[in-house]
Protein backbone atom coordinates (compact mmCIF):
# COMPACT_ATOMS: atom_id res chain seq x y z
CA UNK A 1 0.00 0.00 0.00
CA UNK A 2 1.33 3.39 -0.98
CA UNK A 3 1.78 6.06 1.71
CA UNK A 4 1.14 9.78 1.15
CA UNK A 5 1.75 12.73 3.42
CA UNK A 6 -1.01 15.29 2.84
CA UNK A 7 -0.85 18.98 3.77
CA UNK A 8 -4.28 20.35 4.54
CA UNK A 9 -5.07 24.03 5.24
CA UNK A 10 -8.07 24.99 7.37
CA UNK A 11 -8.42 28.48 5.87
CA UNK A 12 -10.38 31.17 7.70
CA UNK A 13 -11.25 34.67 6.56
CA UNK A 14 -13.41 37.11 8.51
CA UNK A 15 -15.05 34.37 10.57
CA UNK A 16 -15.81 32.03 7.65
CA UNK A 17 -14.04 28.82 6.60
CA UNK A 18 -13.20 27.77 3.06
CA UNK A 19 -14.78 24.55 1.81
CA UNK A 20 -14.20 23.09 -1.65
CA UNK A 21 -16.54 20.68 -3.43
CA UNK A 22 -14.56 17.85 -4.98
CA UNK A 23 -15.02 16.88 -8.62
CA UNK A 24 -17.58 14.11 -9.08
CA UNK A 25 -15.29 11.74 -10.98
CA UNK A 26 -12.06 11.57 -8.97
CA UNK A 27 -10.21 12.06 -5.73
CA UNK A 28 -10.59 10.45 -2.34
CA UNK A 29 -14.04 11.94 -1.69
CA UNK A 30 -15.75 12.51 -5.09
CA UNK A 31 -18.59 15.05 -5.02
CA UNK A 32 -18.28 15.92 -1.34
CA UNK A 33 -17.22 19.13 0.37
CA UNK A 34 -13.70 19.14 1.77
CA UNK A 35 -10.71 21.21 2.77
CA UNK A 36 -8.19 21.84 0.02
CA UNK A 37 -4.74 20.27 0.18
CA UNK A 38 -2.60 17.58 -1.33
CA UNK A 39 0.52 15.51 -1.24
CA UNK A 40 4.03 16.50 -0.25
CA UNK A 41 6.45 15.84 -3.13
CA UNK A 42 9.83 14.11 -2.55
CA UNK A 43 12.40 16.60 -1.27
CA UNK A 44 9.76 19.27 -0.59
CA UNK A 45 9.54 21.01 2.77
CA UNK A 46 6.13 20.88 4.45
CA UNK A 47 5.29 24.61 4.29
CA UNK A 48 6.51 24.74 0.67
CA UNK A 49 4.13 21.89 -0.13
CA UNK A 50 1.25 23.66 1.61
CA UNK A 51 1.83 26.89 -0.30
CA UNK A 52 2.24 25.00 -3.61
CA UNK A 53 -1.00 23.06 -3.10
CA UNK A 54 -2.86 26.28 -2.27
CA UNK A 55 -1.50 27.97 -5.44
CA UNK A 56 -2.34 24.93 -7.61
CA UNK A 57 -5.83 24.36 -6.24
CA UNK A 58 -6.99 27.84 -5.21
CA UNK A 59 -5.00 30.18 -7.45
CA UNK A 60 -2.17 32.67 -7.16
CA UNK A 61 -4.32 35.52 -5.81
CA UNK A 62 -5.25 34.03 -2.41
CA UNK A 63 -2.99 35.63 0.20
CA UNK A 64 -2.33 33.82 3.48
CA UNK A 65 -1.46 36.18 6.32
CA UNK A 66 -0.90 33.40 8.87
CA UNK A 67 0.01 29.69 8.76
CA UNK A 68 0.19 27.72 12.01
CA UNK A 69 0.70 23.94 12.29
CA UNK A 70 -2.30 22.60 14.18
CA UNK A 71 -2.67 18.80 14.29
CA UNK A 72 -2.12 15.56 12.42
CA UNK A 73 -3.98 12.30 11.87
CA UNK A 74 -3.91 9.26 9.63
CA UNK A 75 -6.24 6.83 7.91
CA UNK A 76 -6.57 4.57 4.89
CA UNK A 77 -8.58 5.82 1.90
CA UNK A 78 -9.52 4.68 -1.59
CA UNK A 79 -8.53 7.22 -4.25
CA UNK A 80 -10.41 7.27 -7.57
CA UNK A 81 -8.53 8.57 -10.60
CA UNK A 82 -10.09 10.40 -13.57
CA UNK A 83 -9.72 7.24 -15.70
CA UNK A 84 -11.72 5.23 -13.15
CA UNK A 85 -8.80 3.38 -11.57
CA UNK A 86 -8.81 3.08 -7.79
CA UNK A 87 -5.99 2.77 -5.27
CA UNK A 88 -5.88 2.17 -1.52
CA UNK A 89 -3.55 4.69 0.15
CA UNK A 90 -2.30 5.15 3.71
CA UNK A 91 -2.73 8.91 4.29
CA UNK A 92 -0.93 11.01 6.91
CA UNK A 93 -2.66 14.39 7.21
CA UNK A 94 -0.74 17.46 8.45
CA UNK A 95 -3.38 20.09 9.19
CA UNK A 96 -2.67 23.81 9.41
CA UNK A 97 -4.68 26.74 10.76
CA UNK A 98 -4.48 29.42 8.07
CA UNK A 99 -5.82 32.95 7.88
CA UNK A 100 -6.31 34.53 4.48
CA UNK A 101 -6.08 38.25 3.86
CA UNK A 102 -8.60 38.01 1.01
CA UNK A 103 -11.15 35.68 -0.61
CA UNK A 104 -9.80 35.76 -4.16
CA UNK A 105 -10.13 32.11 -5.24
CA UNK A 106 -9.70 30.49 -8.66
CA UNK A 107 -10.28 26.73 -8.22
CA UNK A 108 -8.65 24.15 -10.46
CA UNK A 109 -10.35 21.12 -12.01
CA UNK A 110 -10.04 19.05 -8.82
CA UNK A 111 -13.00 21.05 -7.50
CA UNK A 112 -16.39 21.97 -8.92
CA UNK A 113 -17.26 24.70 -6.43
CA UNK A 114 -16.14 26.50 -3.28
CA UNK A 115 -17.79 28.41 -0.44
CA UNK A 116 -16.82 30.60 2.49
CA UNK A 117 -18.97 29.16 5.28
CA UNK A 118 -19.93 30.52 8.71
CA UNK A 119 -19.19 28.03 11.52
CA UNK A 120 -22.88 27.59 12.33
CA UNK A 121 -23.57 26.56 8.70
CA UNK A 122 -20.76 24.00 8.27
CA UNK A 123 -23.00 21.08 9.27
CA UNK A 124 -25.39 21.90 6.41
CA UNK A 125 -22.79 20.79 3.84
CA UNK A 126 -22.19 17.21 2.63
CA UNK A 127 -18.76 17.05 4.25
CA UNK A 128 -16.48 14.09 3.69
CA UNK A 129 -15.63 12.04 6.76
CA UNK A 130 -12.07 13.43 7.07
CA UNK A 131 -13.26 17.05 6.92
CA UNK A 132 -16.09 16.31 9.35
CA UNK A 133 -13.55 14.80 11.78
CA UNK A 134 -11.20 17.79 11.43
CA UNK A 135 -13.94 20.37 11.96
CA UNK A 136 -15.31 18.46 14.97
CA UNK A 137 -11.82 18.27 16.49
CA UNK A 138 -11.59 22.05 16.04
CA UNK A 139 -14.94 22.47 17.85
CA UNK A 140 -16.71 23.76 14.74
CA UNK A 141 -19.25 20.90 14.47
Curated annotation (Swiss-Prot):
Coiled coil: none
Intervals of motif Nudix box: 38-59
EC number: 3.6.1.9, 3.6.1.12, 3.6.1.-, 3.6.1.23
InterPro entries: Nucleoside_triphosphatase_NudI, Nudix_hydrolase, NUDIX_hydrolase-like_dom_sf, NUDIX_hydrolase_CS, NUDIX_hydrolase_dom
Top-level enzyme category: hydrolase
Needed co-factor(s): Mg(2+)
Description of how the protein assembles with itself and partners: Monomer.
Protein name: Nucleoside triphosphatase NudI
Organism the protein comes from: Salmonella typhimurium (strain LT2 / SGSC1412 / ATCC 700720)
